[in-house]
């Protein structure tokens, strides 16, 4: 009887140890908040890839959507902090909302890493910033046209003007295009990132300039509209098109030979890299307050099979976890 009691006590102690260790392990699991600006596909693909990567790294992740509302974004940041998250990965809505997010995170002692929206005042208060080099992103597209079109008229279909990104893309593209003095930009129209407006813009451009030989379209959603317009008019074979983003439908256009080149800035691999950097900051392995260029990739038919896809598989994301992290760089001049 005494032996049975000893055995029972031993089992109870063992169970308590297991429960204690289990609780300790659970407490040690890091939790990250991913706050996206909207629920649009770009941000959905980014958060999906980050969630898959987090799971493979043994990290818990909670996803918030701010719906382009600064007040909602701040509420998301505050809710994440109240949950006791270890870090925040965020696509901010605006500069003012970034400031509010940084203030709240700093007050709570929670590292916060921004994807886009760099501002020099906020860099030392953050875990880091990551975004693309806007001018540098578009420049190789102009260079490709300069090398692959001997001469002729070029058109540019821009995104929404006034925010600075569309203007920077145009500037970078023109720098690359300038390598061939026989190419002349004869039309530059804003289609506000909208497929239908791009369709209408391309129709008007080709009507006014039926001998156009090249078009730079600043994102692939607009490129779909441009391709549809040129197909309807029977001019698609005449016009070489370059674009940006690397979205699934953009890669489809490349596969079909309707888009010659795109420069991709996949939200998937960018979010995975940003997550890894943030985790490094949290663990004390990476110094906070640095700026990083987001991963980009020029994609044509020749390398389509190795493109960093927005809708990457779990196997692809697992391979990204083995890649070297982006190195910190000197931040771009503030606008």
Walk through the language-model features, giving the residues of each.
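Extracytoplasmic "Venus flytrap"
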Residues: 30-53, 57, 62-79, 83-85, ...
């Amino acid at each position: 009887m005494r032996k049975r009691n000893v055995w029972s006590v031993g089992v109870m102690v063992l169970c308590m140890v297991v429960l204690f260790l289990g609780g300790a392990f659970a407490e040690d699991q890091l939790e990250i908040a991913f706050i996206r600006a909207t629920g649009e596909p770009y941000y959905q693909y980014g958060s999906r890839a980050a969630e898959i990567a987090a799971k493979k790294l043994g990290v818990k992740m909670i996803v918030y959507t701010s719906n382009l509302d600064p007040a909602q974004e701040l509420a998301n940041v505050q809710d994440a902090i109240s949950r006791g998250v270890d870090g925040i990965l965020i696509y901010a809505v605006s500069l003012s909302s970034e400031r509010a997010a940084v203030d709240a995170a700093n007050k709570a002692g929670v590292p916060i890493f921004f994807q886009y929206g760099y501002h020099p005042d906020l860099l030392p208060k953050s875990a880091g910033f990551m975004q693309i080099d806007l001018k540098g992103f578009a420049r190789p597209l102009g260079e490709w046209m300069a090398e692959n079109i001997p001469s002729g008229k070029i058109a540019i279909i821009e995104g929404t003007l006034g925010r600075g990104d569309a203007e920077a893309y145009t500037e970078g593209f023109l720098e690359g295009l300038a390598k061939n003095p026989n190419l002349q930009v004869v039309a530059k129209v804003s289609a506000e990132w909208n497929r239908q407006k791009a369709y209408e813009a391309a129709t008007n451009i080709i009507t006014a300039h039926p001998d156009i030989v090249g078009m730079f379209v600043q994102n692939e959603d607009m490129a779909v509209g441009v391709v549809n317009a040129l197909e309807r008019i029977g001019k698609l074979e005449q016009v070489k098109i370059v674009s940006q983003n690397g979205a699934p439908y953009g890669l489809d256009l490349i596969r079909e030979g309707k888009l010659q080149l795109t420069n991709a800035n996949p939200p998937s691999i960018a979010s995975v890299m940003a997550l890894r950097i943030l985790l490094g900051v949290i663990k004390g392995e990476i110094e906070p307050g640095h700026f990083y260029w987001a991963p980009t990739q020029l994609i044509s038919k020749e390398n389509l099979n190795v493109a960093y896809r927005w809708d990457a598989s779990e196997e692809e994301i697992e391979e990204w976890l083995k890649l070297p992290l982006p190195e910190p760089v000197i931040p771009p001049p503030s606008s």
